[in-house]
């Protein structure tokens, strides 16, 4: 063996230190290059326009793609039942797994965004979502739908969902938070408006496989926009959050803790607050009465009454038009009025609409349009007031992760309703009982939101 000189260990240590320093320099230069690109975009925009509005537009498109993906199973239900012979209960099982994981991913996604950054987390989710949807075109067995749509698509869409909206809004906006949250939440309605009639028409003419390929391509198109136009924070482009005073303290640095530890520690602290459980269970009811029941089963329900998939999808799209207006208005109202009172009216009107739904099919002209208008106006209008209440109670720093857990309740409710309504339809041959149960839950939710009291819960959270 060659001899080792006395100076060689020190020389190797120096080489290792030099290589480590060079790697740090390369990373710093890469960050500077990314920030320079963002600064160029800000310079090109110029004037009084705050870059946060452009970043919000990018987030809107992300949520739009996720909404289109989330709405796709409702279009696939009847074609899969006809072509592959799967039962509606089996398809509902896959959808319920998707919905549950969509919600349970939220708090961990919020913690991951704090630890690893918005862009890496979002890009990973979009790639997984696009690949999973494309892979589903080769499904032949119902268990494959559970794995692909339930696991892969459920987790990836959960990352780019309401938790992303809450994280982005708290980072980029000091003023107009309710309005921006309302606009971003309305992306779900816009996704239905853009995707559902088109996807239903494709499914009716060409089958269900081209549908999933179109959705996969739509999700992939958003990826470069995220890579080049979405900064991590306003400070990365030498800006403050929109509307923040000049003397406000700087935002805290990103946490280096394990996202799992952050998510569970936040849950432990928040769960000691009564307000957390009131928000959690009210959002459980929200999910059961929207994504779980109407979002999953309305097209199939219309088919039971002799309507085509395109007609059912068009009804959902019409509801999306009203929801686009209602949710944006809800965001504006949440900046100005008591959010508990807003939630009382939203849940109450939704409950009455769902109780009316089974009777709407028997009214020739005004039945379904009347339901679409009243139900659509507050379909997701509950989100801006809920986010505002969570931020007021738990503070700006903890709000995204806390809201992630509240969204988990939303999606657990949705999964419960998606599976439960499918089982009721399979055993009774009708959705009437499911509509009545869903409407009754909403009226109960309207009552419990009035019990939210910020003072004691804030004190409890701080004491913890």
Role assignments for model-derived ranges:
Residues 64, 132, 144-159, 284, ...:
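Hydrophobic core of transmembrane alpha-helices in multi-pass small-molecule transporters
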Residues 73-77, 268-327, 417:
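Extracytoplasmic gate region of multi-pass secondary transporters
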Residues 80, 159-173, 381-394:
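Intracellular juxtamembrane helix-capping segments at the cytosolic ends
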Residues 80-81, 112-113, 194, 198-206, ...:
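Interfacial helix-cap and linker-helix signal at transmembrane-aqueous boundaries
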Residues 105-118, 327-338, 426:
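Helix-to-loop junctions at the C-terminal end of transmembrane segments
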Residues 127-140, 349-362:
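C-terminal ends and interior cores of transmembrane alpha-helices
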Residues 149-186:
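Cytoplasmic helix-loop-helix junction between adjacent transmembrane helices
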Residues 187-235:
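Helix-loop-helix hairpin linking two adjacent transmembrane segments in secondary transporters
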